[in-house]
Amino acid sequence: YISNDISLALTHILRASVDGIAIGKNTLLIDSPKLDVRNVNIQDSNPIKIVFWGADPNIDSHISKHSDIYFLTSFTHKADNVIPIIDVNFDLNKLFKNLNINSLLIEGGNYIHKYFTANALYDKFYWFKSTNNIHSGIKFSDEVIESLKNKYKPINKFLLKDNQLTTYTCM
């Protein structure tokens, strides 16, 4: 893990507090996160899992491997856990309401954060930073950082041992 035990515990509390957790395709393929709540004191939480898949047609093996995940795609597919978002006017809020998702935690990746920050779609943004140097992997793009600076304001900073959590809210 990049983050420490305190950051991981807070992440699982955040996961337990929402109805759904979403990631992008690359995060699924590279990190293969479980997207569950792993905290012995919070056992009844089971957020709905969503992957913004996009246009990549190589989805079949992932659909069967992750039958507990809804895949949002830009194409139709026969699987029950694939939801096509083809219409430009597709209403994500309506979809989330139909899935009983009133609160959604976006955990990554960079493309999703880029879209959501640029369009000021986050109510709150939690940024966990580690002092550990990471030489590979996906970093936030400059666009995400610029959107955070221009469209969000930091409301709290917490030092968590060798990690820092900064929370932002939309301006």
Question: PLM features: residue spans?
Answer:
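Enzymes that bind and transform nitrogen-containing heteroaromatic metabolites
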Residues: 1-171
